[in-house]
Each structure stands twice: as C-alpha cells, then as structure tokens.
C-alpha cells in the first residue's frame, strides 16, 4: 500500500495534475511543474504518514494505559481479597478464643478484636456486636461459695469489665468534645486515626453489667431491656440518637443520667431503680416510665420533655423531684404512687394528669424531716385522704379539666 502511494506521488500524480493545460509550456516548464507537484504530493504523504504514526502511537499508548489500569484493578482486587481473608482469619481466631477456658486468652481475644475494628472500619459494628454478645452471656453477679469458684468468678469479672471498658473507650466522646458536639461527631467520616467510633448501635438485652461507666456515650441507638446493672451506673452526658430501650432493666445502686440526651423514643417501662438522677436530661421524642419503680429518690429537676412523658403506675417510694422540669407536650402520672417528698416547682404551667394517683401517707406531717418532708404539687391538684384508710390519699383536681382537653392515649414505643 505504501509503495502504491509513493508511485502515485512520484509518477502518476505529477502526470495527471500537469497534463492540462499543456499549451504554451516549454519542456523545462513542464518538468518544473511536475517536480513541484511531485514535491507537494510527497510532502502530503509524509504528513499523512506522520499523522498516521501519531494515531498509531496514541492508540498504542491508550491501550497500554488500559492494560496497566486493568492490571492495577486486578492487583487491587487480589490485595483486597488477601486482606479480607486475613481479617476474617483474625476475626475467627479471636472469636474462637473468646470461648477459651483461660481468662488471659479471652482477654487477648478482646484486645485483638478491638485492634481489628480500629484498623478496619467496616468491621466495627460487627466487633461491637460480638462484645455485646459476650456481655449477654449468662453471668452470676453473686459471689461463688468455694475458693476455686471465687477465683474463676473474679477472672470472669475482669474479662467482662475489660469488654465494657473497650466499648466505652470507643463509644464515649473524647474529653475535648462536648455533648453539644455529639451530632457532629456522629456525622464525621470514620477514620483509622480516631479513637471514637461513630455510627454504632448497642444491643445489651439481658446483659449483666458491673460498674457500667459510660459518661459521654454517643450511639445511634441502644437496647438494655432486662439488663442487670450492678454497682453504680453512669450515663452522664450520654446521647442516644435513636431508640433507647431500658424496659425491665434493674439498677441495684445509683443510676445517673444527668444531662443525657434521648433523641428518639425512650422506654423505661417496668425498670427498677434504687436511686436515680435525670437532672437536666432531655427527652425529645417521648419517654415511657410505665410501672417503673424508684425504691429511693429520683431527681428529674430541669429535665425537658419534647413528646409524651408517661409515668403511669410508677411507684415513687422515696422523693420525686421535678423542679423546673419542662413538659412541651402532655404528661401523665395516672395511678402513680408517691410515698415520699414531691416537688413540681416550675415557672411554666404544667399540663399533667394525676387521675388515680395515690399518696402515702396523705399528710406531710407523717414524713421524715428535711427535704423529704416537703410536698409541692402542681397548681390545681391536692391530696384527698381516703375515708376508709387515713394512711392513704388520692390526688384530685381542684378545678376539673374540660374532658375535651384530656390528654389522648399515648402511643407506645416501637420496641416491645
């Protein structure tokens, strides 16, 4: 093909392009004209050859680029597969070690899982689920009888406390991050360099938890239904961005939820407290305390309620302090029982129902001295002693509310 083009440029082309017109041209002029045409055609062919070479070179370059990209993709894929296999092997080995009879082996497994999750962002929720599952395993809070059993019990306790500390270390906000910045901390892109793990949920249903200190906890959601909290429980400044469930949970010592924020539905139905604090706690989407029991005092001063606040059939065996609490929506204390001091001091009206609420004893003079001897009910409510039992009384409204204004039935949380 190249020879034909060259022959055309050197012989045929000049002859075709110079044969007309030929009148009046000398032989020398014809020869010069053919040479000029020949030179032009050769230059054109050279240009085409250069252009073709460039096209071929570029095509070859692009093909090489595609081949290199394909090789890199395949190498990356192979590398990821190797990494995944390695991570899975480490994960399976650590999980297997959690069932080991020796406590030091179980402790090593916990730390291995935490390190694995720190370096592999996609494994964090899975590792948290494993730690929660370990804490949900049966565990007796009572001391064992024999020395050998006591030693085993003590070792098991240390393993469980380590699991709790690892969770707290990665799910509680750093000290330099305030509770007000919890939302930004949750929205931040997870990083291998950050100790805090955003986007995590907890499931500790039925778990036995000891000295559960999770001040500054920040999670999407958490379920502690039927959990048993031994010793002190600290949730100061905690933030629950989704559902928070404590249904049927029991706290055998002080439980502190001061300045905690509950952004979603919150369920404390049937929970049992010894002494509890919810000072300045915020419940944004409804809280249910139905049939909860407070064996000693509960302090809910300055707490805020953005949705329904349901305290139906709650038993307050000690003091119940709601000073300066703010209820944006309706609140109900229907059929609740108050046995100690009570205070509902507030600078804003309280829209609450106390129908059927019981007061034991009905008169403040039977209470012990001090703050527990004070009872300050919301305006419009007073205690009416029972005719049959002078040690009992019922809260009644001085000015009955219009039936059309009675709080509608409260919807329950979505978790049963």
Predicted regions and their residues:
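N-terminal leader/targeting and pre-domain segments
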Residues: 68-71, 77-80, 85, 89-107, ...
